[in-house]
C-alpha cells in the first residue's frame, strides 16, 4: 500500500507542478513546452511495477488531456517512454547484482530487444531535444517510446520475475534497500 501511495503522490506532485506552470503561461500569454518521462507500461502493464505503472499512466493521461486543453494557448505537452537505459540508479534497483548474476539485466535486456542492445543516454537526450525544439511545434499530446521496439515485441517487461522464489525476492529486497540507503546517504549533507 505504501508503494501505491508513493506512486500516487508522485503523480499528484507532477500534475500540480504542470498545472502551476501551465496556468502561469496562460495568464502571461506565453507559449510553453512540457516534457514528461513515463514508461511503456502505460500501454502494456507489467507485473511487479504496479505503483510505477499507475503513476506513469496518470502522467500519460494528463499529457494527452492538457495537450488538447492548452493547445489553443500554444502550450505543448509530450512524454518520452524509455526502455532499458543502463544507469546506476535504475540497474541497482531493477536487477541488484550479486556475484551470481553480474550483468544479468544487461544480457536479458539485450537478448529480448529486437535491436539487440540497451539504449544510450545520448539517444534519450537527442529525443528530448527534438521534442523541445521550436521546429517541432506541431507535435503535442504524444508519448514516444524509445526502446528499440522492446515493448512491441516483449510486452510486460518484468514477466520473467514470476519465476523467482521467495528467497530470491528476499535477496532482491535486501539489495534494493542497501542501494536506496547508499543513495540517501549521498544526498544528505551534514
Can you describe what each PLM-predicted range is?
Residues 1-7, 12:
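Single conserved hydrophobic/aromatic residue that forms the stacking wall/gate
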Residues 23, 68-72, 137:
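Alpha-helical segment proximal to the catalytic Tyr-Lys
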Residues 44-50, 72, 116, 121, ...:
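Active-site loop immediately N-terminal to the catalytic Tyr-X3-Lys motif
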Residues 72, 84-112, 154-183:
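A glycine/serine/threonine-rich, flexible loop-to-helix segment
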Residues 79, 101-139, 146-148, 173-190:
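C-terminal helical subdomain
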Amino acid at each position: 500500500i505504501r508503494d501505491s501511495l508513493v506512486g500516487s503522490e508522485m503523480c499528484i506532485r507532477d500534475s500540480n507542478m504542470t498545472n502551476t506552470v501551465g496556468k502561469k503561461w496562460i495568464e502571461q500569454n506565453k507559449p510553453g513546452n512540457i516534457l514528461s518521462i513515463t514508461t511503456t507500461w502505460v500501454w502494456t502493464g507489467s507485473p511487479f511495477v504496479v505503483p510505477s505503472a499507475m503513476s506513469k499512466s496518470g502522467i500519460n493521461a494528463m499529457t494527452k488531456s492538457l495537450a488538447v486543453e492548452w493547445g489553443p494557448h500554444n502550450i505543448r505537452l509530450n512524454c518520452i517512454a524509455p526502455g532499458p537505459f543502463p544507469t546506476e540508479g535504475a540497474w541497482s534497483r531493477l536487477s541488484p547484482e550479486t556475484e551470481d548474476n553480474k550483468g544479468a539485466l544487461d544480457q536479458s535486456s539485450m537478448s529480448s530487444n529486437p535491436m539487440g542492445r540497451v539504449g544510450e543516454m545520448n539517444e534519450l537526450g537527442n529525443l528530448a531535444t527534438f521534442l523541445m525544439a521550436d521546429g517541432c511545434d506541431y507535435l503535442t499530446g504524444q508519448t514516444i517510446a524509445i526502446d528499440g521496439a522492446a515493448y512491441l515485441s516483449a510486452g510486460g517487461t518484468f514477466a520473467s520475475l514470476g519465476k523467482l522464489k521467495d528467497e530470491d525476492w528476499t535477496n532482491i529486497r535486501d539489495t534494493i534497500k542497501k542501494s536506496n540507503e547508499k543513495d540517501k546517504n549521498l544526498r544528505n549533507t551534514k
